[in-house]
Amino acid sequence: MEEYHRHCDEVGFNADEAHNIVKECIDGVLGGEDYNQNNINQWTASIVEQSLTHLVKLGKAYKYIVTCAVVQRSAYGFHTASSCFWDTTSDGTCTVRWENRTMNCIVNVFAIAIVL
C-alpha cells in the first residue's frame, strides 16, 4: 500500500469530498452497464474497494466503513436507512445514490475519527 501522511489538524468529516470520490468509483464501475445479476458481486466489491482505497489515500485520521447495494430498477422502489451514535463534530457519513435505466445503487460511507 502506498505511504501517506495523516492531516491530524483537520476537524470534521468532509462529506462533499467523500461524495465525489464515491460517485467517480460508481461511474467507473457501473457507467454504461445494464443490470445483470451475474455481475452484482463483482460490481459491489469493486465499488467498495475502490472507494475505500481512495478515501484512505486522503491521509485523514479516520476509520472508514463503506457499504454498497445494487438492485434492479423496479416500480416498487428501493429504501434504505442507517443510524449512528457518535461525535458529530468529528465523525460523519455520506450517502451516494446513483441510478440508470436498469438499476439503482446506494453507497454509504461512515467515517469514524481516530483520536490519539
Curated annotation (Swiss-Prot):
One of its GO terms (molecular function) is dynein intermediate chain binding. InterPro entries: Tctex-1-like, Tctex-1-like_sf. Pfam families: Tctex-1. Gene3D superfamilies: Tctex-1 (3.30.1140.40). It is found in: Nucleus; Cytoplasm, Cytoskeleton; Chromosome, Centromere, Kinetochore. Disulfide bonds: none annotated. GO terms for biological process: cell division; microtubule-based movement; regulation of mitotic cell cycle. GO terms for cellular component: cytoplasm; cytoplasmic dynein complex; kinetochore; microtubule; nucleus. Keywords: Cell cycle, Cell division, Centromere, Chromosome, Cytoplasm, Cytoskeleton, Dynein, Kinetochore, Microtubule, Mitosis, Motor protein, Nitration, Nucleus, Transport. The modification 3'-nitrotyrosine is found at Y4. Coiled coil: none annotated. PANTHER family: DYNEIN LIGHT CHAIN TCTEX-TYPE 3 (PTHR21255:SF20), T-COMPLEX-ASSOCIATED-TESTIS-EXPRESSED 1/ DYNEIN LIGHT CHAIN (PTHR21255). Belongs to the dynein light chain Tctex-type family. Acts as one of several non-catalytic accessory components of the cytoplasmic dynein 1 complex that are thought to be involved in linking dynein to cargos and to adapter proteins that regulate dynein function. Cytoplasmic dynein 1 acts as a motor for the intracellular retrograde motility of vesicles and organelles along microtubules. Probably binds BUB3 as part of transport cargo. Required for the efficient progression through mitosis. Homodimer. The cytoplasmic dynein 1 complex consists of two catalytic heavy chains (HCs) and a number of non-catalytic subunits presented by intermediate chains (ICs), light intermediate chains (LICs) and light chains (LCs); the composition seems to vary in respect to the IC, LIC and LC composition. The heavy chain homodimer serves as a scaffold for the probable homodimeric assembly of the respective non-catalytic subunits. The ICs and LICs bind directly to the HC dimer and the LCs assemble on the IC dimer. DYNLT1 and DYNLT3 compete for association with dynein IC (DYNC1I1 or DYNC1I2). This is Dynein light chain Tctex-type 3. It comes from Canis lupus familiaris (Dog).
